[in-house]
């Protein structure tokens, strides 16, 4: 038990000692951060940032909580997604209403849950662009 605790502490100390990657360092100039991030991205990741998917099925409501759906987790694991569209929509097209979809409070929780998942479960942790009517420019 003591050995396990010591190993966990050492791993935590080692992780804290690692320097922050330039693209994650808010004190650096934006141009330097962007250049660093682009140099780390694969072609697939760059193309993936242009990918926009319909997202009204990317969350599950569990009481007063919202969590990423298994569909969302699968899509994130299988490929790069840079933008979600229609995440918050309630209309006949999505078959969601304020009763079956997201209230304003749940919409905020959904956005946070999806962003957190992508940041924590992708290689570079690039946040999503969330939009409702972005296709019009």
Language-model regions: role of each:
Residues 10-20:
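Bacterial Sec-dependent signal peptides at the C-terminal "C-region" and cleavage site
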Residues 18-137:
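N-terminal beta-rich core of secreted/periplasmic extracellular enzymes
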Residues 2-12:
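Bacterial N-terminal signal peptides
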């Amino acid at each position: 038990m003591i050995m396990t605790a010591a190993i966990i502490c050492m791993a935590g100390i080692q992780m804290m000692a690692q320097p922050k990657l330039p693209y994650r360092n808010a004190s650096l100039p934006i141009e330097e951060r962007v250049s660093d991030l682009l140099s780390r991205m694969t072609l697939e990741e760059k193309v993936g940032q242009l990918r926009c998917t319909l997202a009204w099925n990317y969350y599950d409501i569990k009481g007063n909580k919202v969590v990423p759906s298994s569909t969302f987790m699968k899509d994130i694991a299988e490929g790069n997604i840079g933008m979600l569209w229609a995440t918050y929509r309630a209309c006949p097209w999505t078959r969601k209403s304020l009763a079956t979809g997201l209230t304003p409070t749940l919409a905020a929780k959904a956005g946070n849950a999806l962003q957190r998942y992508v940041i924590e479960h992708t290689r570079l942790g690039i946040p999503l662009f969330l939009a409702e009517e972005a296709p019009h420019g």
